UniProtKB/Swiss-Prot annotation:
The keyword Secreted applies. InterPro entries: 11-beta-HSD (IPR051253), NAD(P)-bd_dom_sf (IPR036291), Sc_DH/Rdtase_CS (IPR020904), SDR_fam (IPR002347). Substrate binds at S168. This is Hydroxysteroid 11-beta-dehydrogenase 1-like protein. Its EC number is 1.1.1.-.
Length: 286
């Protein structure tokens, strides 16, 4: 019995490695595609915009900071984007979400990719009972994603397009210091996985790609974790390329970096050992 289990584990790991390492992404397939990227002024969202720009896509970029968006726009045009339009918006506002989709459709004449990347500010600390912040974070990290996807879905259906959702390892395997953030990502996982079922049952051509990311070296992430974590962070540009590639390939899920997939796969096999291992990667001084 033990031999069979080990054999199947080996087969699964080999198959996963082959799946991860395959490289079938052709950037030319994204030329002239119409793309809306949220949270595009910095971090992974900024890098995602640059990868689409290199492929010659038409972009609508949205975030709260206009000056930062203008800088990203200039760089996108240098890299080869066909057009770049900006929408300054705060995703905590219900009206702003509808405005973003409406302006994107007006500027682009339709939509092929909706990339949901924005997040609300989240302190990296132990749970302190701040329910109000959690409520606000769910509004920005979860409900705004639903609002945007719902508004864009009829137009993505017309184009047989894709929804790309930036998620996190915390949506699969909870980690310390991220209680409210993890709750919002778990909610995203549940909603969009269920929506994928429903679209398939309705023969709707829209694909949904959930991007499960580990620790990425964005400025905001590095500032928050400081001396609280021992694991290495991975490049935002590489993570962004993996996101764009997975979306173009209409993958159900994408995991980056590579070890996130097996970590999620084995999460329920040895939960106590998993938790022990995770907790040893974090520092806590009471």
């Amino acid at each position: 019995m033990g031999i069979h289990i080990k054999r199947w584990c080996f087969i699964i790991l080999v198959a996963s490695a082959a799946y991860i390492l395959r490289d079938s992404f052709d950037p030319e397939t994204l030329a002239n595609t119409r793309v809306l990227v949220t949270g595009a002024s910095t971090g992974i969202g900024e890098e995602i915009a640059y990868h689409y720009a290199r492929a010659g896509a038409k972009l609508v970029l949205t975030a709260r900071r206009e000056h930062a968006l203008q800088e990203v726009k200039s760089r996108c045009l240098e890299l080869g984007a066909k057009n770049v339009f900006l929408v300054v918006a705060d995703m905590a506002s219900h009206n702003a979400r509808e405005q973003v989709v409406a302006e994107a459709l007006s500027a682009l004449g339709g939509l092929d990719y909706l990339v949901l990347n924005h997040i609300g500010w989240t302190p990296f600390k132990m749970w302190d009972g701040d329910v109000n912040h959690t409520r606000w974070l769910m509004e920005v990290n979860f409900l705004s994603y639903i609002h945007l996807a719902t508004a864009a879905l009829p137009y993505l259906t017309q184009s047989k397009g894709s929804i790309i959702v930036l998620s996190s390892l915390t949506a699969k395997t909870p980690i310390p210091y991220t209680t409210s953030y993890a709750a919002s990502k778990f909610a995203l996982e549940g909603f969009f996985s269920s929506l994928r079922h429903e679209l398939t049952m309705q023969n709707n051509p829209v694909s949904i790609t959930l991007c499960i990311l580990g620790l990425i070296d964005t400025q905001s992430a590095m500032e928050k974790i400081k001396d609280k974590i021992t694991m290495s962070a991975y490049p935002a540009s590489d993570a962004a390329l993996a996101v764009v590639s997975a979306g173009a390939g209409r993958q159900r899920e994408m995991y980056y970096p590579w070890f996130v997939r097996p970590l999620c796969f084995f999460r329920d096999w040895f939960p106590q050992h998993r938790d022990w291992f995770i907790q040893r990667m974090y520092h806590y001084n009471s």
